Amino acid sequence: MSYSEKPEDITKEEWMDKLNNVHIQRADMNRLIMNYLVTEGFKEAAEKFRMESGIEPNVDLDSLDERIKIREMVLKGQIQEAIALINSLHPELLDTNRYLYFHLQQQHLIELIRLRETEAALEFAQSQLAEQGEESRECLTEMERTLALLAFDNPEESPFGDLLNMMQRQKVWSEVNQAVLDYENRESTPKLAKLLKLLLWAQNELDQKKVKYSRMTDLSKGTIEDPK
């Protein structure tokens, strides 16, 4: 077939047959899983997986303890305690990462609003966040969006209610986790996440070239649709 000829379309069944014929070593898959558990700080799961798979992590799992404490604090909304622990572990981290520090302070403001502590929230925003808002347009926009929650009787149902969702705390924790790992010169992004990004990039390249292929539409379930 010459390069000018159009390649034959591959059906979903043919595509799945090709995938099923690709052999991946179980040990390689297990190492990907262990890497994810360690990077995300899931110590208990990593210990159990080590026993089940025989795969050794590339770090001492006890070194995850402090990150786990920080994660628990952030996910419980105990932001000031999390900041104190971060400062005790890495005194220069928040000084050199001002956006991370702002997002932690912003999250504390969100927690005050969640508790309906309006006066404390306004005072905290004025004393701790106003200066950063003046220096950064992005910070100012985020601060204004957060303070807008105070204008609603039921802020959870407002256009800005997503700030009060658990996913917001998770977002802040992910940022903290990556910053701590970077500061410690450790891998901050799981290899599995990098592979998924590579998959999305490859599919985007195929889409731009208008190639018909079996596209993965749901990464969490591995759902593959028929070629279009």
Swiss-Prot record:
* Keyword flag Magnesium: no
Q: Which GO terms fall under biological process for this protein?
A: determination of dorsal identity; positive regulation of canonical Wnt signaling pathway; proteasome-mediated ubiquitin-dependent protein catabolic process; Wnt signaling pathway
Q: What happens when the gene is disrupted?
A: Morpholino knockdown produces morphants which exhibit loss or reduction of dorsal embryonic structures and Wnt signaling deficiency.
Under SMART domains, the record lists:
CRA, CTLH, LisH
Where does the LisH domain start and stop, copy by copy? Answer: 25-57
Q: Where are the transmembrane segments?
A: none
Q: Provide the Gene Ontology terms for cellular component.
A: cytoplasm; nucleus
Judging by the UniProt lineage, the source's domain of life is Eukaryota
| Keywords from the UniProt entry | Developmental protein, Wnt signaling pathway
Q: Pinpoint the CTLH domain residues.
A: 63-120
Asked if the keyword Cell wall biogenesis/degradation belongs to this entry, the reply reads: no
InterPro entries the UniProt entry points to: CRA_dom (IPR013144), CTLH/CRA (IPR024964), CTLH_C (IPR006595), LisH (IPR006594), Ubq-SigPath_Reg (IPR050618)
Which residues constitute the signal peptide according to the record?
none
Q: Which family does it belong to?
A: Belongs to the GID8 family.
Q: What functional role does this protein have?
A: Core component of the CTLH E3 ubiquitin-protein ligase complex that selectively accepts ubiquitin from UBE2H and mediates ubiquitination and subsequent proteasomal degradation of target proteins. Acts as a positive regulator of Wnt signaling pathway by promoting beta-catenin (CTNNB1) nuclear accumulation. Required for normal Wnt signaling and normal dorsoventral patterning during embryogenesis.
Assembly and interactions?
Identified in the CTLH complex that contains at least MAEA, RMND5A (or alternatively its paralog RMND5B), GID8, WDR26, and RANBP9 and/or RANBP10. Interacts with CTNNB1.
Instruction: Give the protein's recorded name.
Output: Glucose-induced degradation protein 8-A homolog
Taxonomic lineage per UniProt? Answer: Eukaryota, Metazoa, Chordata, Craniata, Vertebrata
